[in-house]
């Protein structure tokens, strides 16, 4: 079975998830977003491995795959895990850019920065997915603007007792 067909089948299984409406996505928008994310993550390579150890089409980290109960080396399970993880981020953040940032940098980073973390990798990742979405829908491909968090994370002061 072809990769694009598996992506379509996976997105179709999840097209009625409540998270989509909360993030302003319909079934078609969800399919395009999911396919664009998979393209950005792995260029449709089911055996892609990142320098950090993420694996497969959805570039699932080993711990994320375990928490989702999927085998990242199984193409269908990897896609299902990626879909469920992205849907969890959409449900939590109710915003496409924040959900993509959470998928890329981790949800704790989005919470820590109260927005898209100011990391070049995350900014470029979100912009790339928007460009792919535009291409897949026949929209003009332009450089989308990604709104980064405008503040540093709040951290309690560190007290060091030298005595």
PLM features per residue range, with description:
Residues 38-41, 63, 103:
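Active-site-proximal beta-strand/loop segments in catalytic clefts of secreted hydrolases
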Residues 1, 21-24, 47-51, 64-75, ...:
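Second-shell loop/turn segments in exported
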Residues 101-147:
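Catalytic and substrate-binding regions of cell-wall glycan-acting enzymes that process beta-1,4-linked
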Residues 144-163:
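Low-complexity, Gly/Ser/Thr/Pro-rich intrinsically disordered linker/tail segments
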Residues 33, 49-70, 78-86, 107-108, ...:
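Substrate-binding/active-site groove segments that recognize
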Residues 5-12, 32-35, 80-87, 97, ...:
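Solvent-exposed, polar/charged alpha-helical surfaces in well-ordered, non-transmembrane soluble domains
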Residues 1-43:
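Export/targeting segments at the very N-terminus of extracytoplasmic proteins
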Residues 15-29, 47-49, 94-102, 140-143:
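Surface-exposed patches in mature extracellular/periplasmic domains of secreted proteins
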